[in-house]
Regions:
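Amphipathic alpha-helical repeat scaffolds of TPR domains
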Residues: 14-29, 60, 70-89, 112-123
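TPR-repeat structural position
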Residues: 31-38, 93, 131
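Boundary/linker segments of alpha-helical solenoid repeat arrays
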Residues: 52-58, 110-114, 145-154
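Solenoid-like repeat scaffolds
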Residues: 7-12, 70, 102-111, 139-147
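Alpha-solenoid helical repeat scaffolds
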Residues: 39, 43-46, 50, 101, ...
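Acidic, Ser/Thr- and Gly/Pro-rich intrinsically disordered linkers and low-complexity segments
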Residues: 50-73
Length: 154
């Protein structure tokens, strides 16, 4: 069966993502993780999702289903958790804020609620001195999720 041009492009993008992801982990293993590769990998992932949604608007609507839809070939959810941790560890709070906001926007969050991402966003805001914005964000979050201990802790 002949592969369409769109499928070829998507395969190249996934290969690029996989290579960048591998470089991220090799860097950690070697003790010299390069944050630009982590950032590039995230940007490629977002580009993949947006491109896939052009032909299939339901593609990857939920983060936990993204791995399922790709037959678990790319460990997207696990890599994203590691990326957020890497940004937090490096105290790259403006980028962490931007990444958290993008993740909250790009996925529907109906299957799984993004408590950890919301907590990291609140922390990133506070760490940047955006105390009032962080306070309002946390109050709104707690109002939406009265029984969520992470919302109360934020």
């Amino acid at each position: 069966m002949m592969e369409t041009e769109g499928a070829k492009i998507m395969n190249r993008q996934w290969k690029k993502y996989d290579q960048l992801m591998e470089n991220c982990y090799l860097g950690i293993a070697g003790g010299d993780s390069v944050i630009n590769e982590w950032n590039d990998c995230f940007d490629v992932l977002i580009q993949i999702i947006e491109n896939e949604r052009e032909s299939n608007p339901d593609f990857g609507r939920e983060l936990d289903l993204l791995d399922d839809e790709t037959d678990y070939r790319h460990d997207v959810q696990g890599w994203l958790e590691d990326y957020l941790d890497e940004l937090d560890m490096r105290e790259m709070y403006p980028r962490l804020e931007a990444v958290c906001r993008k993740l909250l926007k790009i996925f529907d969050w109906k299957e799984e609620y993004p408590s950890e991402i919301r907590f990291m966003l609140a922390s990133a805001l506070g760490s940047q001195g955006k105390v009032e914005e962080a306070r309002k964000y946390c109050e709104n979050w707690e109002e939406q999720e009265k029984d969520n201990p992470l919302a109360a802790a934020a």
